[in-house]
């Protein structure tokens, strides 16, 4: 930054053939009066530790760096080589974005200082005075950093400073400092709001994952119950077929017994055979009665399985509704976060462009903080269907 003596230019150089284990180059263009502590403070904003080796400032740290003089002689360029890891790529990109935003803010301050120089030049053009004095002030204003590097001046006597110009410069410095303080406060508030939204979003994501796990368990249980129901139905069909076969045998035995009674009423052998047939028929009847009991029991079990299956389906539908509701909440929070981010960017641009936003920023920030999240209406639960045995 050439507009003021307390700033620097940060450039992140990425070669086209950069690999995962290559070295990142961070170039800092400093004024000659910039100290090592100020350089370290600027480097810490980017998430890295930078040690500047300036003349007259000793440092005990060892870091690959290169000190280069600029072409015009007003600046010193320190190239600091930072070893980056492939796993920290996203963090590096985030730090680069922060550096770009800070450079943008510095550029805006530089534009303000350039505008102040133009205003002072226009005032000097309008006000009559000593042409040599105006020429000296014009030479000072046209310098890239706004001050002379050489200790010698144009005249042997110390120059007189215009009080109005000094007051304008002081007021501009105070305004820039106030703007930076308010901007940092807005960024801190935005960071806290973003952290709160991220915590809420992570909580909803955990709830959604838990709901998905519970839903998967319910689906597995329903599949198991369905397999058991199919097995019971298969057994039930087999018992019904056996029941029909036994009924046919009973009818045949009764018919044979009746024929024997008609044909051989007086024959003992026939009586014994008839008694044996009667015993067999009695045994068949007991088996039929037992099969009827088993059939009714299996039917009750099937009805209970069907009822449990329907209840499980109702639970699954309610879980699906809960998951959908959580997804809608997540989408709503993401939309609110994006909207708040856009509003903050618009507010920052508006505040920097106009320079008068103390009350408006506070009111808009309070309005942004009061975000209401409306819960979407939950779907009605499915009715519970119970099978009644008749």
UniProtKB/Swiss-Prot annotation:
Q: Which GO terms describe its molecular function?
A: structural constituent of skin epidermis
Compartments in which it is found: Secreted
Q: Name one GO biological process term.
A: biomineral tissue development
Q: What is its main location?
A: secreted
| Record-linked InterPro entries | Tuftelin_GRINL1A/MYZAP/CCD68
GO CC term (a single one): cytoplasm
Task: Give the keywords, sorted.
Answer: Biomineralization, Coiled coil, Secreted
Q: In which tissues is it expressed?
A: Ameloblasts, and also non-odontogenic tissues including kidney, lung, liver and testis.
- Signal peptide location in the record? none
Residues of the region (Disordered) are 356-383
Q: Which residues form a coiled coil?
A: 88-126, 163-352
Protein family according to the UniProt entry:
Belongs to the tuftelin family.
Q: How does it assemble?
A: Interacts with TFIP11. May form oligomers.
According to its UniProt entry, the function of this protein is described as: Involved in the structural organization of the epidermis. Involved in the mineralization and structural organization of enamel.
The protein depicted here goes by the name: Tuftelin
Q: Which organism is it from?
A: Mus musculus (Mouse)
Q: Which gene encodes it?
A: Tuft1
């Amino acid at each position: 930054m050439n507009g003021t003596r307390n700033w620097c230019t940060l450039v992140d150089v990425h070669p086209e053939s950069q690999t995962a284990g290559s070295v990142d180059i961070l170039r800092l263009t400093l004024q000659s009066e910039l100290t090592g502590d100020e350089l370290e403070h600027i480097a810490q904003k980017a998430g890295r530790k930078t040690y500047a080796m300036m003349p007259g400032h000793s440092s005990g740290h060892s870091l690959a760096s290169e000190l280069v003089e600029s072409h015009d002689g007003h600046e010193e360029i320190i190239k600091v080589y930072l070893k980056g890891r492939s796993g920290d790529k996203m963090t590096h990109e985030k730090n680069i974005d922060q550096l770009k935003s800070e450079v943008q803010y510095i550029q805006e301050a530089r534009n303000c200082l350039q505008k102040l120089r133009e205003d002072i030049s226009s005032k000097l053009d309008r006000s009559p005075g000593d042409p040599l004095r105006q020429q000296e002030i014009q030479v000072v204003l046209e310098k890239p950093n706004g001050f002379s590097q050489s200790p010698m001046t144009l005249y042997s006597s110390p120059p007189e400073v215009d009080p109005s110009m000094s007051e304008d410069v002081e007021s501009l410095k105070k305004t820039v400092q106030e703007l930076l303080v308010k901007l940092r406060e807005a960024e801190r508030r935005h960071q806290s709001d973003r952290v709160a939204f991220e915590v809420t979003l992570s909580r909803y994501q955990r709830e959604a994952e838990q709901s998905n796990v519970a839903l998967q368990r319910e689906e597995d249980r329903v599949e198991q119950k369905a397999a058991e129901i199919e097995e019971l139905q298969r057994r039930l069909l087999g018992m019904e077929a056996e029941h029909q076969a036994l009924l046919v045998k009973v009818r045949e035995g009764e018919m044979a017994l009746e024929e024997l009674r008609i044909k051989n009423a007086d024959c003992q052998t026939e009586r014994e055979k008839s008694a044996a047939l009667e015993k067999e028929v009695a045994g068949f009847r007991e088996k039929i009665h037992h099969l009827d009991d088993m059939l009714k029991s299996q039917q009750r079990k099937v009805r209970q399985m069907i009822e449990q299956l329907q209840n499980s389906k109702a639970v699954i539908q309610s879980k699906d509704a809960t998951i959908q509701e959580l997804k809608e909440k997540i989408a709503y929070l993401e939309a609110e976060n994006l909207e708040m981010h856009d509003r903050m960017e618009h507010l920052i641009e508006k505040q920097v462009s106009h320079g008068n936003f103390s009350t408006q920023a506070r009111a808009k920030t309070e309005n942004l903080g009061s975000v209401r999240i409306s819960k979407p209406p939950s779907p009605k639960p499915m009715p519970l269907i119970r099978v009644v045995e008749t």
